[in-house]
A protein has these predicted regions:
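Structural alpha/beta surface segment adjacent to cysteine/selenocysteine redox centers
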Residues: 12, 18-119
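Extreme N-terminal starter segment of soluble prokaryotic enzymes
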Residues: 2-7
Length: 122
């Protein structure tokens, strides 16, 4: 039976994208499935859908921060909520598209995810 194609739509600005990213290689090894990374611009999707990002809603934001910490603790992931949130990533995500056409894609996204969600850089 052929392996299923799984697309992972992500934006470096999303802490949930980061946490999922930290688990993907493990998942690929355990299942033999290959995950296809699909860079998106989450801010543009929010505008298109006319919604406020969950992290910018005060009530949802409090829950989001607790939920992210619980996940990070459970899976022993280095993580801290970015003090500059919401971070602007349009240029980074454009770079991810270019990196995806070259051999350095994984290194590129690893570095930016760590900068955003471990080192809390902008």
């Amino acid at each position: 039976m052929a392996n299923k194609k799984i697309d992972f739509y992500f934006d470096i600005s999303s802490p949930y994208s980061y946490l999922a990213h930290t688990q993907i290689r493990k998942y690929e090894k355990e299942t033999g499935e290959k995950i296809n990374y699909m860079p998106i611009f989450l801010g543009g999707l929010h505008r298109l859908a006319d919604i406020t990002a969950p992290g910018l809603n005060p009530l949802r934001g409090k829950y989001l921060i607790k939920d992210l910490k619980l996940f990070a603790d459970k899976y022993k992931i280095k993580y801290q909520f970015n003090r500059y949130f919401p971070i602007k990533t349009i240029q980074i995500m454009r770079g991810a598209i270019v990196a995806g056409q070259n051999d350095y894609f994984q290194n590129y996204i690893d570095k930016f995810f760590i900068a955003a969600w471990v080192d809390s850089l902008n």
